[in-house]
Amino acid sequence: MKKLLFFTFLILVIGIPSVYAHPFLLDSEPSQAASAPIGTTQIITKYSEAVEIDFSELKVFDSDGNQVDNRDTTYYDGENSLLITTPPLEDGVYTVTSMVLSKVDGHLVLAAIMFGVGEAKVDTSLLESQEESETTFLPEAAARFPGIVGQTVVLGSAIVAIAIWGTRQKYFGKDNLTLISKTYHSKFSKVTGIALVSVLVSNFIMIAVQTVRLETSPLDVLGTTFGATWLMRMILTIVLLGIWFWMERKSRLTGKKHVPMLIASLVLIFTTTLLGHGTATELAAPMILDYVHSLLSSVWIGGVIFLAFVVLPTLAKLDWIDK
C-alpha cells in the first residue's frame, strides 16, 4: 500500500509542469538586447500564461521616447503571445513596454525589453534596472483574504458537522437533546453566518479593486475571465446565504440538513482553484492538487474553528445542565 501511494505521488510530481505565478514575459522577437535588421516591422512577445487582449498592450518607443508603433496589439499564436506592428524601423535602440492582464487570476504584470536595430547596440548597463513587476497593492490582498477564510470556515463546519456532530447527537439522551440542539443551532448559525458575510463582502471588494486597477467599469471587468469566475462565485455565495436562511428556520439541524451547504461550499472553493495558477497550465493534475489543497485546508482549519466555537460551547452547555 505504501509503495502504491509513493508511486502515485511520484507520478503526480513528475507529470506536473512548472507553474508560474503570473503571466511573466518568457521570450520576445527581437529578444532582449538583440540586434534586429533595419526594416523590422513587428515585435512578438510570449508569456507564461494566457492574457486578456482587451486589457493588455504593447508599446514601442525610440531612443527619444517617441511611440513609434501602430497601436495594434493583438494575439499572435494563441492567448499566450502578443504581436504589435511598426513602420519599418531605422537604425537605433528601441524599447518595448508590455502590460498584460492575466486571464487566470486577473493580475496585471509590467515588463520591458530593449533591442537594437542595424548597427545600434543596447547599453547592457540599462538592462540591470529592467525587471518585471506585478501591479499588486494591499487592497487586492485584503479583498481576497476574508473570502478565503470565510469559505474555509463554512466548508469545514459542514464537513465536521456531518461527519462528527450529526452522528453523536444520539448519545446526549432525550432529556438533554432539545436544549443541546438549540444551543448547537445558535452557535452553528452564528459562525457560518459571519463566514458567509465575510465571503460576500470579499466579493464586492474584489470587483471594486479590479475595477480601480483596470480603470474601467464593473461591467467591463465582468467581461473578463476573472469577471466570469467572480460572477460564478457571487451566485454561489447567494445560494449559500439562501441555504443558511433555510437552515436557520429549522428547529433542529440533523446531519442530512447540512448536505446542501456542503455541496454548495465544495463548488465555491472550486472558484478559488479557477483563480489559481494551476489553471494556467490547462492540465487536470495541477488543478486537482490545488482543489485538494483547499479541501484539506477547509477540513483542518474550518474544522478546528467549528470545534472551538460551536461544539465546545455546546458541550459546555451540557456540563452546565448536568451540574
Language-model-derived ranges and their functions:
Residues 7-16:
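Bacterial N-terminal signal peptides
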Residues 43-72:
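Short, surface-exposed alpha-helix to beta-strand junction/turn motifs within ectodomains of secreted
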Residues 1-5:
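Bacterial N-terminal signal peptides that target proteins for export
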Residues 28-33:
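Short, solvent-exposed loop/edge segments of extracellular or virion-exposed proteins
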Residues 24, 56, 72-73, 78-91, ...:
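Polytopic transmembrane helical bundles with strong interfacial aromatic enrichment
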Residues 15-27:
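Proline/serine/threonine-rich low-complexity linkers at boundaries of modular beta-sandwich domains
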Residues 41-43, 94:
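Hydrophobic core residues within well-ordered beta-strands of beta-rich domains
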Residues 34-39:
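Short, solvent-exposed loop/linker segments at the N-terminal edge
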